[in-house]
Amino acid sequence: AGELPVGGEGTFLYAVEYARQHDHGANPRRFALDYWLVEPGVKIGPASLKAGYERLEGNGTVGLLTPLATLHAFNGWADKFLSTPASGLRDFYLDAAYKVPGKGPLSGLTLRAVWHDYGSTTGGIAYGREWNALASYPLGKRFTLTAKLARYEADGFATDTTKLWFQIETTL
C-alpha cells in the first residue's frame, strides 16, 4: 500500500494484498483458500476516490476465517459479512471522501460515501448491494462527533437492513 505524487495536488493511491489460508494438522475440513485485494485510487487536495475489489474465498463448506479482523470497517457497516460465508465473499466497491479544508466553521468536516456490490466466490450467488454514508466533525481538539448510515439491499444473502449510528470519540 502507498501513495505516489502525480503533480500538483494529485496523488495516486494503491493497495495490493494477498494471503493464503489452509487447514492444519488433523483438521477434517481439508481446504486452501485465498484472500486478495486490489485498490487503486486518486487523491486531489481534500478529495479522494478509490475503487476496490476484495475476495475472501470459500469452497462451499468453509469460508476464509478472519477471527481477529474488523470486517465492519471493510465489508460494509450493515455488518452482514462479519464472518465469511461458506461460498466466499467478493466485494467490489467505490469509496469517495472529502474533508473540508481551511479555518471556517466547517473546517475538518469529513464526508464519505461507499457503495458495495457483494457476491460469492463460488456458486455465482449475488448477495446484494450496500450504501454507506458518514459525516464526522471535530468538536475542539479532543472530541469528534460522527454519524454513520448503512443500507444493505439483499439479493441472495441475509435480509434488507438499515442501520444508523451516532458516536462521540475522544482523544486522551
What are these regions (language model features)?
Residues 1-7, 41-45, 97-101, 136-142, ...:
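Structural signature of outer-membrane beta-barrel channels/translocons
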Residues 1-33, 145, 165-169:
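Surface-exposed extracellular loop regions of Gram-negative outer-membrane beta-barrel proteins
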Residues 29-74:
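Long, well-ordered mid-to-C-terminal structural blocks that present hydrophobic/aromatic surfaces
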